[in-house]
């Protein structure tokens, strides 16, 4: 049993070594000419290093999208709506050199141009004060100094208090309720 387990371990190790070996680098190793950063594409050609901080990765992503080794549905990304009609069109079939630096083929968009019409109404509100408070679960949310205009509220910000909840009808929280509901019975005083 030990001999079969050892043979299996040796076979798995040999398989891993064979699968991870790169035949191009074994033949090209010659003293000082070998560079650990050199890479080869699917056709066996050396790829140039575009820059030292990942330029090679950009090239590899470009080659993966247009290589014949990747199936069409994997290299093709999501469709986008055409600006010329309601029909959804696939990605443009222009060569990678003509479709932008990253080869996306997508029209570049600014964050402000994103269509937010399908989002909730809460997202469209820019300020918390614009939210409609009429549907709040408690009916006692009131503002003090509601007779002041919004200009006065901004001008006298220190005099304008935060929103408050009216708790005067509860036994705790107002002077009026302390007279009505004392904590100690009157006959003990």
Curated annotation (Swiss-Prot):
Localization, UniProt: Secreted
Protein name: Orcokinin peptides
Alphabetized UniProt keyword annotations: Cleavage on pair of basic residues, Neuropeptide, Secreted, Signal
Propeptide segments, given as residue ranges: 22-124, 145-174
GO biological process, one term: neuropeptide signaling pathway
Signal peptide, first to last residue: 1-21
Family, as annotated: Belongs to the orcokinin family.
Organism: Agrotis ipsilon (Black cutworm moth)
